[in-house]
Amino acid sequence: MMPTQRLAEADPQIAKLIREETRRQAEGLELIASENFVSPAVLEALGSTLTNKYAEGYPGKRYYGGCEVVDQVEQLAIDRAKQLFGADHANVQPHAGSQANMAAYFALAKPGDTVLAMSLNFGGHLTHGSPVNFSGKLFKIVPYGLRQSDETIDMDEVARLAREHKPRILMVGASAYSRTLHFDRFAEIANEVGAAMVVDMAHIAGLVAAGLHPSPVPHSEIVTTTTHKTLRGPRGGMILCREAHAKTLNSQIFPGIQGGPLEHVIAAKAVAFGEALRPEFKAYQRRIVENAQVLAEGLKSAGLRLVSGGTDNHLMLVDLRPKKLTGKIAEEALGKAGITVNKNMIPWDPEKPMTTSGIRVGTPALTTRGMGSREMTLVAALIGRVLDAPADEQVLARVRGEVKDLCAHFPMYADRV
């Protein structure tokens, strides 16, 4: 017989921890660039009975019966994704961005083939060739980086390495890069050497959807993304591609690397894509960028150095070496003050990955709460105060109180705290 108790009765320990996490999110400043807050509608879809349904295969071609409804759900997600990004084909089944990238590699290359990708040390992602990741274990990785003069991608180096190594795949994208990615120039290089171009737009997908960052779709064989971050959907992945690659790509996801899709998550993706198709989503993305630029100027006014001097998108990297701090110390001190960031490697970082010389800061979550330029100026000042006295418990306590007061003016998930 099915248990009928609600969570608070059935498992009070988990219920309590969920309330605590909701309170932490509601009462603190979330500045991790890869995090955001989903809408109540997305949460509702995630908690739906769709979680009960197994649906191996694709709409209209399932290996299980009873898929009439989930076929419609998944097709809605596919159609909305294609409309949102102007793509020929969309696969909404990847459980995460890593699976999306794995499928893209397997669709276009064989183990041992050469992949030219941005180094993790300069802002790339683990799945772009880190030796501890499947991508670095299965493929020959040639990394590209930044120019020291302005800390932007060295396109001359990309072209030189492409001509020298003739990669099968040119992987474009980053997890800690604050400047515009010029996909047209990357595509010229890929075409010159006969490489297939794959773009991982996980961080900037929302900006791309809103027309605030150049779209990779017209230039790329395959585009991968997560569905959270700036896109403000559930945690998950997605792949866009040209029709010529659709069949191969689909087979790489299922049965290649995944079994049954998570239809409750796919429903939540569909809801988020529907939200992103509305005019107010473009206004939201504009505010993300505006807030990032105001926050960047505020951090510089607080005496902090930003990698490349600023930002074109939703995030920025703060170089803490002038403050004689590590990213680990800064993350911990800011956390005590109710400000959540993540320690992050900076270009040519002398520290280890679990220590780092920098922090990464982003504005999507605070923008979702409704905060604007005035609040960004205040947040920058609060960060500056903490980093000027990271070991002063009185300063941290005062800032934490101010953070809580600020958050109270922008309530979130009030019915869940």
UniProtKB/Swiss-Prot annotation:
Q: Name the Pfam families on file.
A: SHMT
The record lists the lineage as:
Bacteria, Pseudomonadati, Myxococcota, Myxococcia, Myxococcales
- According to its UniProt record, which cofactors does this protein need? pyridoxal 5'-phosphate
Domain of life, source organism: Bacteria
Name this polypeptide is given: Serine hydroxymethyltransferase
**Gene Ontology annotations of biological process type:** glycine biosynthetic process from serine; tetrahydrofolate interconversion
Q: Name one GO molecular function term.
A: pyridoxal phosphate binding
Q: Give the catalytic activity.
A: (6R)-5,10-methylene-5,6,7,8-tetrahydrofolate + glycine + H2O = (6S)-5,6,7,8-tetrahydrofolate + L-serine
Its job? Catalyzes the reversible interconversion of serine and glycine with tetrahydrofolate (THF) serving as the one-carbon carrier. This reaction serves as the major source of one-carbon groups required for the biosynthesis of purines, thymidylate, methionine, and other important biomolecules. Also exhibits THF-independent aldolase activity toward beta-hydroxyamino acids, producing glycine and aldehydes, via a retro-aldol mechanism.
Q: Which organism is it from?
A: Anaeromyxobacter dehalogenans (strain 2CP-1 / ATCC BAA-258)
Q: Which InterPro entries match?
A: PyrdxlP-dep_Trfase, PyrdxlP-dep_Trfase_major, PyrdxlP-dep_Trfase_small, Ser_HO-MeTrfase, Ser_HO-MeTrfase-like, Ser_HO-MeTrfase_PLP_BS, SHMT-like_dom
> Where is the site Plays an important role in substrate specificity?
H228
Q: Supply the alphabetized keyword list.
A: Amino-acid biosynthesis, Cytoplasm, One-carbon metabolism, Pyridoxal phosphate, Transferase
Where is this protein found? Cytoplasm
Q: What class of enzyme is it?
A: transferase
